[in-house]
Structures are given as C-alpha cells and as structure tokens.
Amino acid sequence: MKTLNEDIKTGNFKPVYLLYGEEAYLKKQYRDRITKAIFPDGDTVNYAYYEGKGINPGELIDLAETMPFFADRRLIVIENSGFFKNASPELADYIKTMPDTACFLFVENEADKRGKMYKAVKSKG
C-alpha cells in the first residue's frame, strides 16, 4: 500500500494494480482514491467498470488498446472477476505488453499467488 500511496501522490501510475483481501472498505477507498487521482476533474469518459465472473477478456484488451479521449490514460476497473482463481491466459499475456495509456485496476476477494495472472500483474504493477 505504501507504493500505491506514493503513486497517488506523484501521479506516476503503473499499468496495472491489484487490490485484494477481505476488507471491502479499504478496497473501495483505494479504488476511489486511484480513480480521483487519475481523473481529478471527475471526467469519466475514459473510465470503464466491469463486475462479475462473465467478463470477456477480449473486450478488456480492446478497450485498453483504445486511445484515451483528451486524457493521458484510460482506467479500467475490474471487480470480482475470478481471473485470479481461473486465469485468462490471453489477458495475462496482454498485461505484460499493455500500453502506458491504459491502467487496469483489479479488485478481488482472493488471488492465487501461484497463478499466471498474479505473476503478470506483479511484474507490471
């Protein structure tokens, strides 16, 4: 969390973040702080929110490849996707090469630290 607080203060964001654990309040608080730091004026044109296990990884990749509209980056928040239990190889491979104009923020209850997604996120975020 120290690194995350530093990123929020400096405005130098990594391409991907993972917030996980049982503490729903803290996850929501950090999610909101990151969103506000990336979009200080409240503009949500470059903000996308996905929730649940039926998320299509290809759709996330397409959105991340889309250039942000009059902003430095696009924020894509993915909550409770299950990607860190049942990894999406396509998304895990993409995270390793994703552009600096996109930022994935994963908010999960659990994350398998042995999984491909966790390792990909750890290498980039």
Task: Label each PLM-derived region with a short phrase.
Residues 1-3, 10, 14-17, 24-28, ...:
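Non-catalytic interfacial helical region
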